């Protein structure tokens, strides 16, 4: 299977050798080829290639939203996120020593939502299921090439900047159907910006983890396999 033999580097007759990865040979402007390469990258990531961490499912410990004017706060706890492995490459840009990538994702989120109000001792609590459709992640990062001990060129990735854009307001439903769910449901329906904020925070955390994996991948695999 992919990932079982590709993590191994051996030395033959004084030369370092790593088995080739199943990547297509892509030109920088061949977006369809790059999309196929991205799919392979996610397969390798799921398999733990070169120490990468699988991120589907992905756990976000908490997302907090403070609303001082309403004297309330919202906390989404232990959000479980799935669907990132089907992320699509929308655009790829090069600008000197910087690269830009735009992803589109459809994500499914579940977690416990707590709504705390100043006039209540106990929070409203419910289980939230949320679908984030067509969320776009615009990622830019600096990079430069370096020589490895095998005299091959590898890529070092600098800190990324991530901007998230929602094309659709996330949809949701709450469980179970109790007295607590009614005020939470009414509040989220009246303030869709809260859903957008939670969606952006979750997607940004997820994409930072994708970039952490790509950073490890790019520094371990010779440069012409770099596709992000």
What are these regions (language model features)?
Residues 2-130, 142-150, 154-156, 228:
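Tubular lipid-binding modules of the TULIP superfamily
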Residues 10, 51, 134, 207-210:
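Short linear sequence motifs
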Residues 105, 135-137:
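Envelope-exposed proteins and targeting segments
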Residues 144-215:
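Extended amphipathic ligand-handling, pore-lining, and cofactor/metal-binding catalytic surfaces
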Residues 213-228:
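Short, low-complexity, Pro/Ser/Thr/Gly-rich segments in the mature regions of secreted, periplasmic
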């Amino acid at each position: 299977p992919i990932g079982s033999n590709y993590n191994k580097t051996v030395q033959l007759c004084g030369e370092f050798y790593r088995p080739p990865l199943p990547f297509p040979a892509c030109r920088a402007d061949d977006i369809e080829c790059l999309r196929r390469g991205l799919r392979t990258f996610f397969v390798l990531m799921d398999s733990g290639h070169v120490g990468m961490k699988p991120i589907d499912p992905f756990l976000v410990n908490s997302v907090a939203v403070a609303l001082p004017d309403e004297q309330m706060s919202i906390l989404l706890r232990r959000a479980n996120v799935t669907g990132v492995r089907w992320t699509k490459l929308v655009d790829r840009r090069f600008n000197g020593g910087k690269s830009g990538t735009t992803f589109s994702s459809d994500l499914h989120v579940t977690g416990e939502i707590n709504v705390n109000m100043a006039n209540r001792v106990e929070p409203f609590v419910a289980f939230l299921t949320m679908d984030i459709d067509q969320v776009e992640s615009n990622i830019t990062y600096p990079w430069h090439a370096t020589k490895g001990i095998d005299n091959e060129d590898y890529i070092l990735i600098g800190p990324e900047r991530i901007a998230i854009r929602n094309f659709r307001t996330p949809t949701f439903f709450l469980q179970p159907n109790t007295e607590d769910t009614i005020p939470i449901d009414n509040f989220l329906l009246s303030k869709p910006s809260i859903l957008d904020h939670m969606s952006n925070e979750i997607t940004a955390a997820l994409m930072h983890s994708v970039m952490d994996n790509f950073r490890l991948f790019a520094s371990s695999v010779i440069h012409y396999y770099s596709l992000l």
